[in-house]
């Protein structure tokens, strides 16, 4: 890793711990009819089983005053998350139209240390902010073995906040976001039991 100064340096950090574990369920609310789409409700829970980023210290790399590296790497975000959404699917031969809308709620959590400064440690609460997502697309068969799909998804994330012990909430600048993803995919059925899927986004 190089900086703006003539000094170069590098630092290796790795973590093979487990990440956050999640589980979900899907339930068909309404089956597809000639005039209405198939509607599926989903709910998912994510547990903070991974290493959370709060309290990980950043230290100056030896012989390079412009480079700091973390003592450890996070494998999760440290909070419980509950998400839910609806998926709509409608067949219009030879195409299939689909759309989805979702919401994810991150629960506020208190940590014994939320500082990244090795010279300081202080507890506090973290609120990662909630997010909304919507998307849609279509898939259609090119022949009996090959199909193509196109989709677009957009995600809106609210600002994250931190609250040091004894102080008021502070928003983290730049933590809110609005991001979109456009995807193209092709599926080819090589056999009755094996398919090859390619995706570009």
Pin down the residues of each PLM region.
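Residue-level detector of the transmembrane beta-barrel scaffold of outer-membrane proteins
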Residues: 1, 24, 38-42, 96-100, ...
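Residues that define the transmembrane beta-barrel architecture of outer-membrane proteins
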Residues: 16-21, 37, 78-82, 126-132, ...
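Transmembrane beta-strands of outer-membrane beta-barrel pores
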Residues: 20, 29, 45-51, 90-94, ...
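Outer membrane beta-barrel transmembrane domains
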Residues: 110-201
